[in-house]
């Protein structure tokens, strides 16, 4: 056989192998095949706007994985001395594997309890968050059934380690480690964070800007403005705005010790929240009491 024919045959064989490879082709399903399927929405190839696609746990296992040792994850607070070997997929690898569209620069993790975590590109690059698939070599649900008292769900996001990359006044960046993740949505920072950006007339107020930066990192996880942000707290942005405007002293107490104001609150206490940070949050949220955004 001539060299040219050999090259053609070899190329054809490679193409056939690629076509039959479990990682080739679109990985998304049109319909749910199992309760453990992860929902995918937004700006990804093969996802029509407004629709939901699915990726199975088995399919996720075919993606490039990493195994890291995790300590200090608040989802496992009752195991403070135990190091966990977590196997999963880096979010940036997941984005490329699911073929996020070029305009997408934000990944949003939605959880069954209404919590949401937003991952802009700089966070993903600096902190390398991981979608966990296994703990100590076991599927998360299997490991939980054997060893753990608090269920993080089929999917959670964690880090090998976390060091804050910035601070706003006394507020330090905190890790985004959602549990019970049911959906990943690809979107844009401009659209999502734009919903809670300060009004143009307040854009030059440094106190409002500081409050926005803190709220964007922290409050947005459990409080929503329309379809953006989390719903876990049951208190939307406008409610916080009215609260900050009408009862600033109580609002500040809510920031430091939420259960003293709302016994049903699941928000963690922050008794060390500095006065400038608390005032910045007040100033920012007060703009939502009367100003349409």
Labelled PLM ranges:
Residues 212, 220, 224-254:
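Gly/Gly-Pro-rich "capping" loops immediately C-terminal to redox-active cysteine motifs
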Residues 1-6:
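Positively charged n-region of N-terminal signal peptides that target proteins for export
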Residues 7-17:
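Bacterial N-terminal signal peptides
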Residues 89-93, 209-220, 249, 253, ...:
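Solvent-exposed, polar/charged alpha-helical surfaces in well-ordered, non-transmembrane soluble domains
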Residues 238-291:
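Extracytoplasmic electron-transfer domains, predominantly the class I c-type cytochrome c fold
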Residues 104, 219, 232, 262-264:
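Short secondary-structure junction motifs
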Residues 12, 290-293:
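Long, contiguous alpha-helical scaffold regions
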Residues 21-210, 217, 228, 236, ...:
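N-terminal intrinsically disordered, low-complexity segments enriched in P/E/S/T
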